[in-house]
């Protein structure tokens, strides 16, 4: 009833002859909001605010109106909330600057962020709320005592939440970051307290960086994150600087992931950057000490943002779970930090859960090691159906878990080093005779992607260099050792097998390798194997790569492929050929091999030649690949391939001669 009265009264003003001192265009701001059913909750706030009504009646204004869906997600106070969504300047999207003063007491700023959208169009945010452009830039004009007042409406997808003082005796309006920290008990922060960090700021005399005018992003650790006890003393003046990003106001939604921002501690002697990470609807912040010193070690520290997007006069504050830059936890401590119901969507919680359920002894072993690198699969990787199936096999799970750590420190910089990423021998893991192999892929923009292969599975490092006192943790996007590709897909995507894949495309040889009803054992020559064969048989290899000789290429590849009702691991082949050769049925004829084990690798003998198995037991969903350092070529192949055109023409010639004789 009241809404109808309010609307009728306002329309009367619109249609008046000017005696009230106010006239307007056909549709006023208030009428536009009233007319939009998706803004009904915001309209209710307008109705109850006399100040907002007066602003709409007499003044220039820009209104940021949250949708009803935005209010459904909002559980904060609505007292005077509407004034924080209004500014006394009429600003279209194009005219929005870096900030806008709101009409709330103290005129706290609303911060503006512009960023490119997924399709290239510009997106604009007010604090953490996105402006819905298709519903925005509505303008109306009213006349007040002869002056024209312009009013602009923007619709946003999130309610803007101001900093509110809960002390009626001494209210605080529009605080800067230090006022917020210093008077944190007087603000609504839920159960979070920041006394310890405040104490460190005062002791280190760093108040100035939190009171300075400008545009800053502040990360404030809560008291809970300062355990165990020695941790507070490690937060010195440089660590405090590492919690502040200058010249950027970074709210969580508009800030892209994995973009590195320089902190206040960024000099020749010490360099620290900060970036954001999203995981299961939680936001994490990562400090990366790129250049360290004796007191500040290199590496990444990961902290959950427990209360984000607190706007202050000189920027934005995020309350975080623990201090950045402080490396005082073991690898085991890092994994166990995700214990508890509230941590079950932490970035590697499911991996921790798997170790807890299947590999307690592995956790004990890792904790004893002074130098360890753990490759921890993300939650999404462990949710894959193929992984869930394997989790039923306890023995297999233990073997897979052992594949995910090595007994040395491998920070990203060391992996990027050619000697590691191109190391032919691989890096031994805790799994029996299993190694990890690394590859550095250069992106078009100069960025590098690091991949790790273990048990035939290629995984990408998505979060690197999480530092611990006894090692490094890298978060990867797949579970190593759990096949998810067919033999064909593995050939297609592994750069080491490019030539073998290329040759197999001739005459449809590769097509069979996608058949999941069969079990393949493929002795696949790697790139260096073809290069070596080119030295021994230059003419033959040259012809094999020519289309005219594809018939012979297919025959030679068939010699490398065993199709059976089972796969043959190198351990199984070694067992089968302890005292004699083993004969397998290849796709072409028979394949007679002997196998011997040397240290942690294997060699196979074929036709009197010993060939090293460069990488054994690369598992696929329909078979297994043994990457070998040689090609199964015979002298007779050289003679036969001497004239491929004759071989392909011979059957036609015989038929022609028989037909002629019969006639």
What are these regions (language model features)?
Residues 3-7, 13-663:
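Mature, structured domains of secreted/extracytosolic soluble proteins
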């Amino acid at each position: 009833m009241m809404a109808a009265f309010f609307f009728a009264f306002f329309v009367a003003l619109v249609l008046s002859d000017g005696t009230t001192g106010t006239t307007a265009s056909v549709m006023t701001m208030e009428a536009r909001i009233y007319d939009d059913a998706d803004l009904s909750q915001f309209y209710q706030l307008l109705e109850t605010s006399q100040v907002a009504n007066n602003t709409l009646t007499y003044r220039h204004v820009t209104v940021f109106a949250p949708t009803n869906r935005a209010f459904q997600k909002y559980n904060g106070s609505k007292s005077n909330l509407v004034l924080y969504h209004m500014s006394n300047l009429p600003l279209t999207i194009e005219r929005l600057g870096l900030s806008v003063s709101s009409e709330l007491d103290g005129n706290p700023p609303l911060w503006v962020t512009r960023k490119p959208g997924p399709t290239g169009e510009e997106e604009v945010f007010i604090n953490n709320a996105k402006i819905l452009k298709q519903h925005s830039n509505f303008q109306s004009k009213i006349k007040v005592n002869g002056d024209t007042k312009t009013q602009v409406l923007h619709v946003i997808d999130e309610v803007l939440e101001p900093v509110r003082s809960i002390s009626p005796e001494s209210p605080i309006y529009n605080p800067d970051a230090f006022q917020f920290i210093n008077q944190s008990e007087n603000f609504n922060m839920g159960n979070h307290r920041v006394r310890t960090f405040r104490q460190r700021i005062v002791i280190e005399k760093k108040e100035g960086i939190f009171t300075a005018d400008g545009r800053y992003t502040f990360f404030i650790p809560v008291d809970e994150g300062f355990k165990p006890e020695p941790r507070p003393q490690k937060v010195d003046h440089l660590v405090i600087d590492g919690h502040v990003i200058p010249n950027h106001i970074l709210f969580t939604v508009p800030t892209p992931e994995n973009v590195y921002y320089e902190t206040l501690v960024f000099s020749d002697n010490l360099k620290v950057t900060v970036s954001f990470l999203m995981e299961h609807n939680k936001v994490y912040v990562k400090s990366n000490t790129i250049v360290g010193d004796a007191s500040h070690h290199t590496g990444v520290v990961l902290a959950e943002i427990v209360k984000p997007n607190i706007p202050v006069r000189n920027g934005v504050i995020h309350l975080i779970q623990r201090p950045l830059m402080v490396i005082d936890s073991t690898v085991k401590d890092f994994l166990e930090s995700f214990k508890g119901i509230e941590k079950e969507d932490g970035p590697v919680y499911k991996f921790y859960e798997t170790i807890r359920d299947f590999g307690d002894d592995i956790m004990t072993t890792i904790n004893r090691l002074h130098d360890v690198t753990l490759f921890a699969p993300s939650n999404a990787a462990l949710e894959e159906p193929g992984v869930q199936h394997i989790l039923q096999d306890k023995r297999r799970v233990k073997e897979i878990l052992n594949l995910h750590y090595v007994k040395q420190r491998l920070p990203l910089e060391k992996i990027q080093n050619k000697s590691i990423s191109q190391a032919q021998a691989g890096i031994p893991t805790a799994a029996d005779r299993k190694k990890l192999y690394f590859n550095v892929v250069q992106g078009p923009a100069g960025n590098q992607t690091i991949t790790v292969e273990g048990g035939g599975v290629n995984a990408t490092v998505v979060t690197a260099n999480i530092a611990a006192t006894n090692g490094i943790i890298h978060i990867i996007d797949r579970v190593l050792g759990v096949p998810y590709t067919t033999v064909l897909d593995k050939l297609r995507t592994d750069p080491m097998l490019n030539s073998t894949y290329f040759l197999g495309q001739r005459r449809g040889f590769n097509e069979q390798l996608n058949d999941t009803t069969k079990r393949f054992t493929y002795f696949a020559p790697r790139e260096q194997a073809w290069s070596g064969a080119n030295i021994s048989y230059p003419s033959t290899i040259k012809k094999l790569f020519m289309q005219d000789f594809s018939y012979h290429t297919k025959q030679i590849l068939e010699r490398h492929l065993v199709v059976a009702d089972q796969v043959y691991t190198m351990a199984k082949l070694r067992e089968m050929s302890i005292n004699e050769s083993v004969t397998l049925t290849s796709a072409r004829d028979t394949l007679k091999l002997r196998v011997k084990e040397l240290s942690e690798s294997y060699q196979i003998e074929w036709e009197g030649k010993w060939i090293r198995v460069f990488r054994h037991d690369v598992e696929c969903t329909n078979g297994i690949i043994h990457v070998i350092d040689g090609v199964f070529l015979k002298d007779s192949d050289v003679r036969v391939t001497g004239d491929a055109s004759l071989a392909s023409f011979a059957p036609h010639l015989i038929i022609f001669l028989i037909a002629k004789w019969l006639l």
